[in-house]
Swiss-Prot record:
SMART domains: AAA, ClpB_D2-small, zf-C4_ClpX
CDD domains on file: RecA-like_ClpX
Ribonucleoprotein keyword on record: no
GO terms for MF: ATP binding; ATP hydrolysis activity; ATP-dependent protein folding chaperone; protein dimerization activity; unfolded protein binding; zinc ion binding
GO cellular component terms, semicolon-separated: HslUV protease complex
Protein name: ATP-dependent Clp protease ATP-binding subunit ClpX
Gene that specifies this protein: clpX
Source organism: Bordetella avium (strain 197N)
Superkingdom, natural source: Bacteria
General function of this protein: ATP-dependent specificity component of the Clp protease. It directs the protease to specific substrates. Can perform chaperone functions in the absence of ClpP.
Length: 432
């Protein structure tokens, strides 16, 4: 019974669930003929939270895709880069297999984490590979820019801000965050400025590498709740980074020179062997990168050691850029055709225009990243007029449009209708 009478004939209310009286709890909330105390409410919240976390864990533990399936998924969105995709597929599969292994108690063999370093020119697909992996595995993903990071105590973001951003993406679900993928771009920009010690402090170089080292190898990071600032008298959210997969990427401009100096060493003086300078491309040289080259470039040995999987991406040529424009599921040409279709117009980009776009991107040295801006610029006037013109049914783009020597050919609705009628007339004449 929710109500009981005391000695003074006063009604004492009781919780309908645990039967504690109103004097034994802090708060008793009344409903239609029932009462619930604050302790029972807390217990219910804990049960709901545990069930939600168990559901999230079950989703993570669901059938893990094989390396072949991972690469096949990457092939749908990323053109070329077969070698790096195979390396990524194996590394990611082993990483999440390692997490499962860690959940088995009583096994003496402890598997170490295989974080990944992607080396490749600008616009070669480093960021896209990391994003696509996270989407396939249905795990939280956060991207950070290494150039904005500084040592703790200096103006700028410290490395724990990355974990804070990750928690925000996960709605502060710590269990989910601890199995995420973190991609740190421009890692080459925090290399040591020189091998010589300096009286000035390198707050965005070696110091940041040292701070990242702890995070990458696995530590318990303390993050202020709900994105607040750190101050001594507050509770922190504890996030263990041991099972977070870190992928770092960078263009590493100048690394090819370090590799060339190592691989093409020759003596000096009259007795030195005379060898012609090889004409190997940047991508080919990157493929020969060794840990010693990365250390000489400016990364600290400890950080290089924590990134055992090094995948080097090839420089994209004209043919690869044309494929990127047309073949992936979310190819740029398909995106623009969908935009034009929303205005009841068909966008026809001729093959010579595709090659012109690719050549322009190569000249600008922007890789795949520069393709959109070239296409946006070429179609700007057409997209400006299209919504108000109303009767444009087809837009044809050739190489002259891309090179700035012409304008897109616009075909209007009445022209389409006229051509259809003339075609029908020709059919009737032929039949007669």
């Amino acid at each position: 019974m929710p109500e009981k009478k005391g000695s003074a004939d006063a009604k004492v209310l009781h919780c309908s669930f645990c039967n504690k009286s109103q004097h034994e709890v802090r708060k008793l909330i009344a409903g239609p003929s029932v009462f619930i105390c604050d302790e029972c409410i807390d217990l219910c919240n804990d049960i709901i939270r545990e069930e939600a976390q168990a559901t999230a864990r079950a989703a993570i533990r669901s059938e893990l895709p094989t390396p072949v399936e991972i690469k096949s998924f990457l092939d749908q969105y990323v053109i070329g880069q077969t070698g790096p995709k195979r390396m990524l597929a194996v590394a990611v599969y082993n990483h999440y297999k390692r997490i499962r292994h860690g959940e088995i108690k009583g096994d003496e063999v402890e598997l170490s984490k295989s974080n990944i370093m992607l080396i490749g020119p600008t616009g070669s697909g480093k960021t896209l590979l990391a994003q696509t992996l996270a989407r396939m595995l249905n795990v939280p993903f956060v991207m950070a820019d290494a150039t904005t990071l500084t040592e703790a105590g200096y103006v700028g973001e410290d490395v724990e801000n990355i974990i804070q951003k990750l928690l925000q993406n996960c709605n502060y679900d710590v269990e989910k965050a601890q199995r995420a993928i973190i991609y740190i771009d421009e890692i080459d920009k925090i290399s040591r400025k020189s091998d010589n010690p300096s009286i000035t402090r390198d707050v965005s170089g070696e110091g940041v590498q040292q701070a990242l080292l702890k995070l990458i190898e696995g530590t318990v990071a303390s993050v202020p709740p709900q994105g607040g600032r750190k101050h001594p008298n507050q509770d922190f959210v504890q996030v263990d980074t041991t099972n977070i997969l870190f992928i770092v990427g960078g263009a590493f401009d100048g690394l090819e020179k370090v590799i060339r100096d190592r691989t093409e060493k020759s003596g000096i003086g009259f007795s030195a062997a005379v060898r012609a300078k090889s004409e190997r491309g940047v991508g080919e040289l990157f493929g020969e990168a060794e840990p010693e080259d990365l250390i000489k470039f400016g990364l600290i040995p400890e950080l290089v050691g924590r990134l055992p999987v090094v995948a080097t991406l090839d420089e994209l040529d004209e043919a690869a850029l044309v494929q990127i424009l047309t073949e992936p599921k979310n190819a740029l040409i398909k995106q623009f055709q969908k935009l034009f279709a929303m205005e009841s117009a068909e966008l026809d980009i001729r093959p010579d225009a595709l090659h012109a776009i690719a050549r322009k991107a190569l000249q600008r040295k922007t890789g795949a990243r520069g393709l959109r801006s070239i296409l946006e610029s070429a179609l700007l006037d057409t997209m400006y007029d299209l919504p108000t013109a109303g009767n444009i049914r087809r837009v044809v783009v050739d190489a002259n449009v891309i090179e700035g020597d012409g304008k897109p050919l616009l075909i209007y609705a009445d022209e389409v209708a006229g051509s259809d009628e003339s075609a029908q007339g020709e059919v009737r004449d032929a039949a007669a």
